[in-house]
Amino acid sequence: MPQTRSQAQATISFPKRKLSRALNKAKNSSDAKLEPTNVQTVTCSPRVKALPLSPRKRLGDDNLCNTPHLPPCSPPKQGKKENGPPHSHTLKGRRLVFDNQLTIKSPSKRELAKVHQNKILSSVRKSQEITTNSEQRCPLKKESACVRLFKQEGTCYQQAKLVLNTAVPDRLPAREREMDVIRNFLREHICGKKAGSLYLSGAPGTGKTACLSRILQDLKKELKGFKTIMLNCMSLRTAQAVFPAIAQEICQEEVSRPAGKDMMRKLEKHMTAEKGPMIVLVLDEMDQLDSKGQDVLYTLFEWPWLSNSHLVLIGIANTLDLTDRILPRLQAREKCKPQLLNFPPYTRNQIVTILQDRLNQVSRDQVLDNAAVQFCARKVSAVSGDVRKALDVCRRAIEIVESDVKSQTILKPLSECKSPSEPLIPKRVGLIHISQVISEVDGNRMTLSQEGAQDSFPLQQKILVCSLMLLIRQLKIKEVTLGKLYEAYSKVCRKQQVAAVDQSECLSLSGLLEARGILGLKRNKETRLTKVFFKIEEKEIEHALKDKALIGNILATGLP
C-alpha cells in the first residue's frame, strides 16, 4: 500500500513535467534523443525556470524575456495554487510588480502635481491683478447680481429692528431727572453706609425698571462694597415666598423649608451684621406681595430701619398710592416712610426723541419717515404713553415693509436689476404702514362681523364685559376682583334669563378677553382676588355693544 500511494503521487506531477519536456523537444528538434537519465537531469537543470508557464506568475527578468513567447496550449488555471512552481507566491509576486510600477511613476506624479499647483497659483495671481485693474468683468457682475437679489435692502431693516428692541439701551433720553434722583439716592446710602427705602411708581412702559437697571450697572463699575439682589414678584407663587428667595440670594444656598421665625431671624441677623456689605434689594412688581394684613410689605419696609441695618430697599410697582392706600401704618411712623418717585407717562415729544435717538444709531438715512415717527408718537402718547408700545409699532411696520421689499426683489428677473455702481435707496416706512399697525393693535377690538353674519364675539363674553362696565360705574373704581365681577355677572344673567357659567368658566372667559386685548388681569394665588380692568376705552365698548338688542337692554337697565 505505501508503494501504491507513492506511485500515485508521482503520476500526478509527472504529466506536468512531461508536458514541459514535450514543448522543449518541439522547440529543439535538432537536438539528439535524450535518455531516461537525461530526463531527470533536465528537470533539475536551470532551464526549468524558463519554461513557459503563465507569464503572470513569473518574476524578475524571466518574466520580461518569456512574455512574448506564449505557449500554444492554454496556460493552467490561475486560481489554483498547486499549478504553480513549488516556491512561487502569486500574491507576493503581483504586489512586488505593482510596487515597482509605483516607485517608477510616483516622482513624475509629484512633479506634475507641483507644476499644476504652480499654474493654479500663477493664474490666481493674474486674476487678482486683473480684478484690481478692471472691475467690470462678467464673473463679478454675476456674483454681485446674485448677492443683490437677496440682500438688496434687507440689511438696513434688520439693523433698524435691532435698535428698536425693548431691552435696556445705553442711553435713556427724556428720563434725566428721574435718573439723577435715583443715582443720588444710591450714592448717598451706599457711600454713607446708611439704610433707606425708595418706591418707584408709574404706568407700564415709563422706564422705571430700565432706568434703575442702567444706574446699577454703572454703579457696579464706579462703586464697590455693595451687593445687588433683583427679584420679580410676578414669579413668586405666594407673598410669603419672597423671604426664601431673598435668603437664597444672600446666602447663596437653596432654602427648602418655608419662611418662618427662624428664617426671618436669620435674615435680620445677616442684614444687621457689623462687617457685612451694603445690600441693595430691588423688588419689581411689588404690588404682587399683597397679602392678608399686609404683613409681608410691612416687614420689608421695616427692615431698613432696624438697628445697624445696611439694607437699601427699592420697590417698583404700577400703583401710585401703594404706600398711602395699602400701607397706611407707614404714615404714622415717619422714619419708615419710603422716598417716593413717580414716572409720568411719556409725552409725544419724548417718544419722538427716543425713536429718533434709536434710529440715528443705525444710519443717517432713516428707515422711518419723520411724519411716520410723529404720527406713532402722537397715537401712543394719547392712549398710554408706553414707549414699549411705540417701539413695537415701529418694529412691526418695518417688518411689513421688509416683507414687501423681499417679495418684490426675489421675483424680479436678474437682467432687470440695477448695476452695482448705482446707489440703492431703501423703501421707507410711511404713515400708511404705521396706521395699518396701529389699527391692528389699537383698533376697535369690539367690532363685530358685518353683512348680517354671525357675531365673532360670543354672547357670554359680551355679558361679562357689560357686567364689568356696570360694576365699574357703580363702584367708581378702575379695578374689581373676579369674585365681585362674577356676582354681578350672575345677577345680570338671572335678570335676562340667560344661563350663566360657573366661576372657573368665568376665569376662562376673562382669559379669552385678555387675549383679545379688551381686559387686563392681575392674577393672585386665590382666584377670587384676581383683579380685572379694562385695557380700552369704555366709550368704544359701549359704542360697539349698544346696537344689539339684548346688550343694549343690559346697559340701559344697569345692575339689578
Curated annotation (Swiss-Prot):
PTMs per UniProt: Ubiquitinated by the SCF(CCNF) E3 ubiquitin-protein ligase complex.
Effect of residue 74 to D: Does not change protein stability after CHX addition during mitosis
A single GO molecular function term of this UniProt record: nucleotide binding
Locus of motif Cy: 93-100
GO cellular component: cytoplasm; cytosol; intercellular bridge; mitotic spindle; nucleoplasm; nucleus; spindle midzone; spindle pole
Transport among keywords: no
Comp. bias intervals (Polar residues): 1-12, 35-44
Renumbered residue ranges of the record's region Disordered: 1-91
Function: Involved in the initiation of DNA replication. Also participates in checkpoint controls that ensure DNA replication is completed before mitosis is initiated.
Subunit and interaction comment: Interacts with PCNA, ORC1, cyclin-CDK. Interacts with HUWE1. Interacts with ANKRD17. Interacts with GRWD1; origin binding of GRWD1 is dependent on CDC6. Interacts with CDT1; are mutually dependent on one another for loading MCM complexes onto chromatin. Interacts with TTC4. Interacts (via Cy motif) with CCNF; the interaction takes place during G2 and M phase. Interacts with CDH1.
Protein name in UniProt: Cell division control protein 6 homolog
Source species of the chain: Homo sapiens
